[in-house]
Every structure is written in C-alpha cells, then in structure tokens.
C-alpha cells in the first residue's frame, strides 16, 4: 500500500487508497517532532504502508528560524567573503532601509584554500598536500560535522574539490556538500549559497529521516522534492536543499493533474493551510525557476515557481504601534494554535471565521476536535478594544486583511508578470482556502474557483500520485551553431545522470522506466541571464521567438550561446483518482446566521457528501466536509462535477 503524507505547520495530512477509493486523515502536527504526528496518523489508519511519500518542512523551518547546524565552508583563497557580500541587486530599488538577509554561516567558519583554476578548468595553482592538511586541521578544530566545498570554476573541473573531499572523508566522519555535485553551474555566489544551505540543513534532515526510517523499518520512505518529484531517502539525507518546497510542490503537482482532468487551460493554485498560503500559476505545465530566493538567499536548483505568504488559518491578528490592525506573518501554529483550540490567547483568522459563523464548531475536523468559541470571543474583545471597533467589525477586518495579503500574492504570480488573471480559475485547496475563495475570485475578476473534494489534503494527494524526478545540469558555454559538441555534452550528461541515480540506490528496474527530458539555457552573448528551452532543432530560431515573447524584442543577428545543459529523469505519475471514500460525513441541512460585510444573513448549511454530479446550487451556502468548509456567497453559483469537485462561478453583471 502507498501513502502520501504532507506535514504542514498546523496539520499533517494523509492520503491512501483502499478498494479503489481515496481515503484521508488529518491529525494535528507536532512541530517539535514531526515524525510523531506521522506515526500517530498511521496508527489511527491501522496500516503499515509499503511505500510512504513524504512532504516535509523540517529543512524549510530550520532555515527560516536559523536553526540549522554549524558547518565549515571551504572556498578558494580570496573568495571567503562571497557568501557574505552576495549580489548588489536590491529587491526594492528605492528602499533606503534595505536589510541584508540574516546570515546562516559564521564568518569564523570560512576558510580559503590556496589553489586556483582558470575559467576553462585548467590548473593555475595546484592544491598542495600542505594546504589539505591545513584544511583538515581547521575542520577538526571547529568540530564541524558538515562541510561545504565551493571552489572557483569547479563546475568546469572538480579536481580540487574531489581531492579535498577524499582527504576529509578519510580522516573523519562528515556530511560533505560539494558544489560540483549540488550545482554544477557558473556564478560562484549562487553556487556557493546553494551548496552552503545544503550543508547547513542536511544534518538536521538526516537525523529526522533516520529516526523516521527506524520507526518505519518495513516501509520504503521517499521524500518529495521542490521540483515536484520524489527522491529516495538515501539521497534526501544529503540533499536537504532540494526539499525547501517539499509540501507545496505536491499541491502544485496535484493542481496540474486536476486542471488536465477537467481540460482547463490555466489555473492559479491557492494552498491556504494553517500557517501560510502558497500560490502557483499553472498554464498547461508546471512553472519552474532556478532563481528562487529562499529567505534572502538564492537557491539555483530547479524548483516549482511557488510564491509563499504568511497568511493562514493560524495567522495572528495584532495591532502595531500606530494602532493599525495587522494579520500575520506570525502564526499560532498547531501548538498553542488559535484561541479556539483552548490553549492559546491570540486571535487568529480561524477564530475570525468561527466568530463570523463561517466555521461550525460541532463540525470542526468532522467533530473529532473540540473548539471553544468563547475563547475566540474573549481574544477578539481585547483586540477590538485596541482597534476601536466592535468585535464583529474587527473580525471582518481580520478576514479582509488576510484576503488582501493573499490577493497581493496572487498578483505577484500573475499581473506583476504581465499575465491577465481574468481567464484563469482559482484552484482553492488547503483546509482554509474554501472560506476565502469567493472574495479572492471577485477581487481578481477570475473565471471562478474550483474546490476539490479532497481540498484539505490536496497536497498529500499530489504526494500520493508523485513519481521520481532527478535533475542534473552542467555548464558548457558553447555557441548555438556548435551542434556536434552540444549533442556530445547532452549524451555525456545523460550517461552521468543514469550512473548517479544508480549510485543513489535506485533499482535498475525503476531506472529503466525513467524518461529523459533535455533542456538548454540560452542567451545572447554577453547577457547576464538565460532562457531555458527544450532541446530541439533550430535552437537559435526558437530562442529568438522565446526572447521576443518574454521581453518584447529579439536580436536575430546577434550570436546565441548555450550556457547550461539540463537533463531531467522522470518516472510515471500515478493516475489521478477522484473517487473518494464512501464513508460519508452527513447531517440534516439547516439554516445558520452568518455575519458578512452587508450584515447578518441566513446561509443554508449542507453536507458536501450529499451532493451529486450535476447539482447546481446558488449561494448563500456553507458546504461542509469533514475537514473543510466552502463559503459560497449569494452572487455565486456552485456546480458539482466529477469526484464531487465543485466549480463556483460569480454572477456577471
């Protein structure tokens, strides 16, 4: 049996299949020990899965909180400050108070090695045995268990990195992150930062995965990567940097599958959980970037282009020094959680939805978890006094602010990139998104929104259906006309990729099923950026056309060069199954008063499981599932389609 498990900041979600039906479970996360929630969930399910595909936030949270492990960074002499200086690019050009990202590497843990290669990979200054001994002595003195090695031009010739790695691994037990293995590409700052982040996080992830592996000794555990595919646990222990968007990637992958199932050209996914919201614009295929900024630092490996904002059900409402009401980015998380959980006293978005009548206390988590509306109201009263509004006005203000924060995130991936969102659907999933989708759809003038039946566990569904993906790249710096050399580099990288995957412990049977996709990074000679295109005939013409589409112009008579060759090995995804479990969460429909911007209104409350394909219902409605609620305003039409997936359309004037 196969299980997809997504560990979020507030809840841990499970998806598995029995007798042809998808089943789900949601349990509170245990941030101090994420494995505990996984084991509790599996115990409740009562199964010992053969395969577990895990979306994890262990490495992500460790970096955001700067709780990784101290490591030694080895660089070429004279380049010790590269990681500290960074790039001069300013995220906000006119901001006079730009803050540099919080450092994660200690300056005293950086050592420069007296060696040098040319840009062509030729040895200018050999790495001497004396230098190697000096490095070994330095690492031993620091007591580090993790080491990052990023030498100048090692992407062209890794000879010195390999020599250092051999000496280090022979003399002591270390986790080694070598830049020519982590990111075999030009640009020393990006390569160094990516390698250093990996060294900082891998010990944390390795300990966590080993503990999980020990508890699940009869289960093959795989870890979801930021590129939407999973990798074996043996590789994940050494490649923590590849898991920074582990959970959200599962949601984006499932979003693409659902869009294809219903024949929809474009969707913007909205994954609103308890801690944050992840958005991703999908048009026919997953969007990838290799310029991802991870809390101020570049991670230049291929990741799904997902934008995250600190707006979730657990986002705390607070008042700043000027008396303005704010929401997030700090979250109450799973413990103590929103005030209504009975442990904390902070008023959150979940508390606001509860007070406004959008969440029904008796149905929270299918009635499995008791909530305390009176605690929400007590926290709201204190907040309202600070703001100077009535409690209900304050609760509405909290919802309006968090919606505005999410609209800003949605515009970040659409209008700010020159894309008109009005032809797109919002794909709303995550436990909280259904309560906010109507307002977001209206604010962005979208076609409508889609709410899958497994909305609250949708990312776990993406993990359940995931396949293995392995990305490899190499800088080649060749003119686009040099077709023979380009072809040779492609074939060499393919061969190396298969050898590397075999070394990860992947079975030959699985390797034989992998399909190779080849991409090239191209640019006009002298440019400082590239466009990634599939390997094809007439590369120059294809690049001119892509450049015109991206930037509005092209230089047809200007030389084009291939910077990087990329090979992606992919497996076959599990087919998307929309048949949900027959064990229904039902109740007799009733009416309930819900407070809206226009005042109190009567909403009909109906169980999601009582709907059937073809049903069309007009709001105002609360459609309640075991783990989520859909808030349908009166100017929206809800239509039920395959798998009890609900399409909601706004009335057009």
What are these regions (language model features)?
Residues 1-71, 125, 129-148, 162-179, ...:
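N-terminal glycine/serine-rich phosphate-binding loop of ATP-dependent small-molecule kinases
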Residues 4, 13, 45, 50, ...:
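Conserved phosphate-binding loops in N-terminal lobes of ATP-dependent enzymes
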Residues 5-34, 103-120, 370, 467, ...:
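Short glycine-rich, Thr/Ser-proximal phosphate-binding strand/loop in the N-terminal lobe
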Residues 14, 25-30, 72-78, 98-100, ...:
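Glycine-rich phosphate-binding loop of actin/hexokinase-like ATP-binding domains
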Residues 15-18, 23-26, 50-89, 148-161, ...:
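Short beta-strand-loop/turn "lid" adjacent to the catalytic site in phosphate-handling enzymes
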Residues 34-35, 41-45, 180, 184, ...:
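ATP-dependent carbohydrate kinase catalytic cores
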Residues 130-134, 138-141, 264, 274, ...:
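C-terminal, non-catalytic interaction/recognition modules in large multi-subunit enzymes and RNPs
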Residues 150-195, 199, 566-585, 647-652:
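Terminal amphipathic helices with adjacent charged low-complexity linkers/tails
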